[in-house]
């Protein structure tokens, strides 16, 4: 990004076709967090365009205020707390809840940090565990990452939170990235398709590409980073 333009990027490095469909949602949609009496309900403040995974839930999207949300796999995610009676939020609609209700990262962090609901995480249609974490960014360039670890929500917020991949957890990704920063990206970068290696490469290249106010050049630069960290299907 430069001072006036923010260009987010997303690669879908899933092992199979997630049967994605695009949906355009208007403002004023009434929603509920789960098929349960003990859930939260809301009416969407903002319209959004989203991508559905397996056509059962929102995994990525952007709302009319420029808030972008992306849901990625994280093996370490654990939502369970003993004797938890908070209202239920289905993992499949968590991303949509954020897009419906918040215009900025600051707003989302302020509300989600209250932890007023618990996450319900049924298995994915292919049998995989739905262990996921969420990243968001807004039109100002601010970003945040949300990870449920041992039943507690851990939030990382700031303009420096520009890259998220998969395992390990974000704090450990930063530690690994610090090591490679000492070596220097022009000397050597890790080249495997492991999430930690892709995190390091993306973190280096997102700062190495030209920081420009030209929209076409900026988009091309982000795509070049995405190609470098994409994993072939299969």
Language model regions located:
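A contiguous strand-loop segment
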Residues: 1-86, 119
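C-terminus-biased signal that marks the final domain/tail of proteins
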Residues: 1-7, 120-122, 129-131, 139-141, ...
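A short, surface-exposed interaction/processing loop segment used at functional sites
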Residues: 15-36, 154-181
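Generic beta-strand structural signal
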Residues: 58-60, 65-67, 95, 132-134, ...
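Peripheral peptide segments
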Residues: 61, 74-75, 150-152, 207
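Proteins synthesized as precursors that undergo proteolytic processing into mature forms
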Residues: 85-122, 208-211, 215-226
């Amino acid at each position: 990004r430069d001072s006036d333009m923010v260009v987010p990027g997303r690669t879908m490095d899933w092992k199979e076709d997630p049967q994605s469909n695009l949906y355009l949602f208007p403002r004023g949609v009434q929603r509920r967090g789960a098929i349960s009496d003990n859930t939260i309900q809301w009416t969407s403040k903002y319209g959004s365009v989203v991508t559905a995974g397996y056509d059962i839930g929102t995994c990525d999207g952007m709302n009319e205020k420029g808030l972008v949300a992306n849901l990625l796999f994280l093996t370490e995610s654990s939502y369970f707390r003993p004797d938890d009676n908070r209202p239920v939020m289905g993992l499949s609609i968590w991303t949509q809840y954020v897009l419906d209700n918040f215009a900025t990262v600051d707003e989302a962090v302020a509300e989600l940090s209250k932890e007023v609901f618990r996450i319900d995480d049924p298995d994915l249609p292919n049998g995989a565990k739905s262990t996921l974490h969420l990243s968001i960014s807004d039109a100002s360039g601010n970003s945040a990452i949300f990870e449920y670890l041992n039943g507690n929500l851990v939030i990382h917020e700031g303009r420096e939170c520009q890259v998220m991949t998969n395992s390990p957890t974000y704090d450990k990704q930063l530690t690994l990235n610090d090591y490679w920063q000492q070596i220097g990206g022009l000397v050597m970068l890790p080249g495997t398709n492991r999430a930690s290696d892709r995190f390091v490469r993306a973190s280096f290249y997102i700062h190495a590409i030209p920081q420009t106010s030209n929209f076409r050049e900026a988009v091309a630069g982000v795509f070049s980073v995405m190609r470098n960290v994409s994993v072939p299907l299969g």
